[in-house]
Regions:
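ATP-binding pocket architecture of kinase catalytic cores
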Residues: 27-172
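ATP/Mg2+ or Mg2+-diphosphate-binding catalytic cores
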Residues: 304-350
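An alpha-helical support segment within catalytic cores of ATP-dependent transferases
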Residues: 6-20, 135-224, 285, 289, ...
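Active-site activation/catalytic loop segments of kinase-like enzymes and analogous catalytic loops
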Residues: 252-285, 298-318
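Extended, well-ordered alpha-helical scaffold segments
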Residues: 119-122, 179-198, 275, 321-338
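Active-site acidic catalytic loop and adjacent metal/ATP-binding pocket
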Residues: 29-55, 199-255
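Glycine-rich, phosphate-binding/catalytic loops in enzymes
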Residues: 72, 118-119, 240, 257-260
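Conserved N-terminal boundary motif of the eukaryotic protein kinase catalytic domain
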Residues: 19-28
Length: 350
């Protein structure tokens, strides 16, 4: 590793203050839209701390009130205090610098399409372990997950809010933006209305009120952004789960269908069936969960379509080029075509 000249002074100051150790070397290991992450090799010092750590810097966007730093560090502290070791250990936090220090977990990402049945089972086991913590010490302080929705109406509202922002952003844009705007009117909006009507009718037949919140005891602790894109395979083959910026209480139906719908997961149908079957069994204590998951699946499919189109939003304009927006528009159209043809006869949740 080599020290980054632009960040080394910050890393040095942070590690000296928090760990009483100097940085010997550092290297970036991830640059997301909401954070910068560095692997840091430490010099000799406090021997009870590891030789390598992760330093994560969090960004705060204007108008976004979510405390990603506080949520992630607090979550990992809560999980470690309750015996969970499949997540990084939180070591130190520096709120004034919007950063935290975590255990470095050696391993490799789980590549899209490379997941195994055992990996899916480990994912279910992790969600089941979180479910068991719903009454654990400290759970009462956990807030709702980012964009948690506890009624069907709240899901629809979150979809409509995202689409309204896309309409506003694309109404006077370039050619690809105008084509997206026209596609929303001609294709997405009619499908949205069709799906909402189907969901309301199907939910009613299952005794699920459109605006009735799920019971508190049915809610579960959820990473909210859960999938193999946030997993490290350790050298011994076991999985470690990372990225808890959006963690909190959520509807287990959302947790399950997000795993199935996430565009980056690249799970084949066999693994999707396996996950759905085993996840529903792990949450067998949640009344009407199979029916609820089937109902919310297409609603979250609409939301994932809007998420795929985030590059068209004004706050992403400086980070997205025309080629990427064109690609994401094509991906969204493909995603919607698959959703339109299968939502009423869901092969994974039937």
């Amino acid at each position: 590793m080599s020290i980054s000249s632009t960040i080394a002074p910050d890393l040095q100051a942070i590690c000296r203050t928090a760990l009483s150790r100097d940085v010997a070397a550092s290297a970036p290991i991830g640059t997301g839209r909401n954070s910068r992450v560095f692997r840091v090799e430490l010099s000799d010092g406090m021997r009870h701390e590891p030789a390598q750590v992760v330093v994560k810097f969090y960004r705060r966007d204007a108008g976004d009130v979510r405390d990603r730093l506080g949520t992630e560090f607090g979550t990992l502290k809560f999980l470690w205090q309750n015996g969970m070791r499949s997540v990084p250990r939180p070591i130190a936090v520096a709120p004034d610098r919007e950063c935290a220090i975590y255990e470095f977990i050696a391993g490799e990402p789980v590549s899209p399409g490379a997941a195994t049945a055992e990996d899916v089972d480990a994912s279910v086991a992790f969600l089941a372990a979180l479910r068991q913590l719903r009454g654990a010490r400290g759970s009462e302080a956990v807030r709702p997950a980012s964009e948690a929705c506890f009624t069907l109406g709240e899901i629809v509202a979150s979809v409509d809010q995202r689409v309204a922002r896309l309409r506003s952003a694309t109404s006077a844009g370039d050619d690809v933006a105008r084509r997206l705007h026209d596609w929303i009117d001609a294709t997405f909006a009619p499908l949205r209305d069709e799906i909402v009507e189907w969901c309301a009718r199907t939910a009613g037949s299952c005794g699920i009120g459109f605006d009735d919140p799920i019971d508190r005891e049915a809610r579960t602790l959820s990473p909210s952004d859960f999938g193999f894109h946030n997993v490290i395979r350790r050298p011994d083959g076991s999985l470690a789960f990372v990225d808890f910026e959006y963690f909190g209480w959520d509807d287990p139906a959302k947790t399950i269908v997000d795993y199935l719908l996430h565009p980056g997961m690249a799970l084949d149908d066999r693994l999707k069936h396996r996950f759905a079957e085993r996840a529903l069994a792990a949450f067998a204590d949640v009344r009407s969960l199979p029916a609820r998951a089937r109902v919310v699946y297409p609603l979250f499919g609409l939301k994932w379509t809007a998420i795929l189109l985030n590059d068209f939003l004004p706050e992403r304009a400086s980070q997205s080029d025309g080629d990427r927006r064109t690609t994401q528009f094509a991906n969204a159209r493909t995603f919607v075509a698959g959703l339109a043809g299968a939502y009423a006869d869901n092969a994974f949740l039937s």
